[in-house]
């Protein structure tokens, strides 16, 4: 059976006989597939297999064999991102976030659309690292792992102090905060909520034009969420054959 779907290549790994194995993020979720002669210069869709490339893929499915990429029509090579180290680093941060949170073959059309929009807009931003941190917040929201209430997750006490404590997406009062919690000022927490609750993408682009020093805390918050989860994308290859 053949399917055609849009997708962004997240990783590209060489295999035997000039084959390559790619991880593609699509509306159908994370997919792994191999491309015969994908590493060869003679492959007419070779560029569509490069990481951070958006393409329309034709894929052959023959379980239990691994999917095979039959064709790839390059839609956007994201050349600007690949020619700038700060942009490449920020895009890489988003890619790693997807690889560490998304299960293979779990449909995620909304998250895919969000990720593609972030990739398309990140070259426009003055502070790409902050912009990619916004994506991490949106991803936490997508996973249902970000408490946006105004009270402590444990005791339900209203949070009225000047400092807000967060860990793994949960909120804590000063009494229940521990050494690993990440502290946010009221202003920083307000910015966090504005990012999460933004309904239009242009709002995020405009916000990313300001030198707001909160990306390190957002990244730490996301890392605290990962500390309690496994890495889904590493659990897939067992039992798969290329041919």
Swiss-Prot record:
Stored SUPFAM superfamilies: ArfGap/RecO-like zinc finger (SSF57863), Nucleic acid-binding proteins (SSF50249)
Gene symbol of the encoding locus: recO
Similarity comment: Belongs to the RecO family.
GO terms classed as biological process: DNA recombination; double-strand break repair
Coiled-coil portions: none
Organism expressing this protein natively: Chlamydia trachomatis serovar D (strain ATCC VR-885 / DSM 19411 / UW-3/Cx)
Pfam family, any one: RecO_C
Role of this protein: Involved in DNA repair and RecF pathway recombination.
Name of protein: DNA repair protein RecO
Keyword Transferase listed: no
InterPro entries registered for this protein in UniProt: ARFGAP/RecO, NA-bd_OB-fold, RecO, RecO_C
């Amino acid at each position: 059976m053949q399917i055609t779907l849009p997708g962004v290549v997240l990783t590209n790994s060489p295999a035997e006989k000039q084959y390559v194995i790619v991880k593609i993020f699509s509306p159908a979720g994370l997919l792994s597939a191999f491309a015969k002669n994908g590493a060869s210069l003679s492959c007419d869709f070779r560029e569509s297999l490069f990481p951070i490339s958006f393409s329309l893929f034709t894929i052959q499915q023959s379980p239990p064999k691994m999917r095979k990429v039959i064709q790839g029509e390059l839609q956007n090579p994201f050349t600007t991102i690949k020619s700038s180290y700060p942009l490449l680093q920020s895009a890489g941060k988003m890619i790693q976030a997807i690889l560490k949170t998304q299960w293979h073959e779990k449909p995620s059309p909304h998250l895919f659309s969000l990720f593609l929009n972030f990739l398309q807009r990140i070259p426009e931003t003055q502070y790409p690292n902050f912009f990619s941190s916004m994506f991490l917040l949106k991803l936490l929201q997508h996973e249902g792992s970000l408490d946006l209430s105004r009270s402590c997750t444990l005791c339900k006490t209203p949070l009225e102090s000047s400092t807000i404590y967060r860990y793994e997406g949960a909120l804590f009062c000063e009494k229940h905060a521990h050494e690993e919690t990440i502290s946010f000022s009221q202003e920083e927490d307000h910015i966090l909520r504005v990012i999460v609750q933004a309904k239009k993408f242009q709002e995020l682009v405009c916000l990313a034009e300001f030198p707001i020093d909160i990306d390190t805390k957002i990244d730490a918050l996301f890392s605290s969420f990962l500390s309690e989860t496994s890495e889904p994308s590493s659990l897939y290859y067992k039992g798969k054959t290329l041919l």
